[in-house]
């Protein structure tokens, strides 16, 4: 039997260079889950004030505003979409492609 969750696009979320969780696209929207081991680490910090540390998953019908805010804007967004041939309406695809090396503490690496 095929696990449908294996077909979801997802990325590992890194905070200050440490793997901290997974963001994924689901049939209902988006899910973000912190890694339980990360949550237990002394000094672990949340990705955002709107996504405090917890082991239960967060769900949203639209891309979480914090993650959407990591996506480049203006000419850089246009260049990203042109170079990687991304659909401009696919915000999650842009997030997974362009946010590997963001300014700040959070980055996302697409899982293959």
Model-derived features: positions:
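Phosphate/dinucleotide-binding and metal-coordinating scaffold of catalytic cores
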Residues: 1-112
């Amino acid at each position: 039997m095929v696990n449908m969750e294996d077909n979801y696009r997802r990325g590992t979320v890194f905070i200050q260079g440490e793997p901290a969780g997974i963001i994924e696209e689901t049939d209902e929207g988006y899910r973000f889950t912190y890694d339980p081991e990360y949550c237990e680490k002394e000094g672990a910090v949340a990705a955002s004030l709107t996504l405090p540390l917890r082991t239960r998953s967060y769900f949203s019908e639209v891309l979480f505003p914090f993650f959407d805010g990591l996506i480049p804007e203006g000419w850089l967004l246009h260049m990203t979409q042109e170079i990687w041939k991304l659909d401009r309406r696919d915000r999650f695809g842009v997030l997974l492609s362009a946010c590997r090396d963001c300014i700040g503490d959070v980055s996302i690496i697409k899982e293959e």
